[in-house]
Amino acid sequence: MKRASFIDIGTNTALLLIADLDPVNNSIIPVLHRQTIVRLGKNVDEQKIIDHVAMQRLIQCLLDFKELSKEHKAERIVAAGTSALRDAKNRMEIIDEVVMASGIVIKTLSGEEEAALTFTGAIAGMENAPERFTVIDIGGGSTEISMGDMACLDQSVSLDIGSVRLTERLFSDQPPSETEFYAAKEEIDRMFTGNLEPFFAGREHVFGVAGTLTTIAKLVSGQKEFDPAKIHNYPLHYNQVRQLLEELKSLTIEQIIGRGVPEGRADVITMGTLILHQFMRLLGVQEITVSIQGLRYGMALKELQQLQGENSNIL
């Protein structure tokens, strides 16, 4: 048994999973989950640079995660960066600064690597899995869609459709004007066009991961406090997403915060919900099963496979 920490550094949020890896029973046993809204990707879509203030937020977050890892006796810390680090021209400078300040080495994942790890993470430990299914991860900077079965990932794509990226690009305020909202709808449709056809075969069983999906599930279910046990495997219906979108597009940030959305997500959840709505509408998806798993679990599985001395047939 080995205990390790896995950190997913996204455009908006950094997430920590501390888990026990059991190579004998091929299992991942979660010990601790944490997340911090860092907004590393603030203005990266326009400037292609991660600024000093965002970097300092990330460093402080990683120092906190490192302390938690130490408290829980994790033997190793594995950290991966996604869309914001992929896009930033000063990526290596940021990574070097982080190493010097925290001792944590960040690997920047390609979109394809992110999609594959998210797919394997989302299905980790799944019982009675459908024959074929699709996984969607709507992040702050990009959206990853992947399809396959429990044995193999068949198809994946990473698109620059993210809640932070498109909010900065297309909304001047919250609530957005009617013109901005419908322009965003058309832009998302344009970006999805030509990329969704391969996933029609897996549209009957779709799993959604990451903060946008879990926040939407929390809002739809009416939970006052986020309870991972109640969110995991929550069935999210298209009509519920459509109704929530109608509500969110007319609310101020303060009103959205009043609904229980964290301050660092309240300004981008309308766009995140719009992205999900258009994905479901264009692909003809009637229901999505929300999972609290994802990239961190995929990273943990990869570490577990290395412990076993095996190579995954997916990664």
Features from the language model and the residues they span:
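N-terminal basic/disordered segments at the start of proteins
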Residues: 2-29
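Helical "lid/coupling" subdomains associated with nucleotide-phosphate turnover
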Residues: 4, 18, 43-74, 82-132, ...
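Class I SAM-dependent methyltransferase core
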Residues: 6-8, 79, 135-137
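Short, glycine/acidic-enriched loop or turn micro-motifs at the edges of active sites
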Residues: 11, 140, 211-214
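Short, conserved beta-strand segments within well-ordered enzyme catalytic domains
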Residues: 15-17, 39, 78-79
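Conserved ATP-binding subdomain of kinase catalytic cores across diverse folds
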Residues: 25-44, 69-70
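Acidic, divalent-metal-coordinating active-site segment for phosphoryl/phosphodiester hydrolysis
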Residues: 141-147
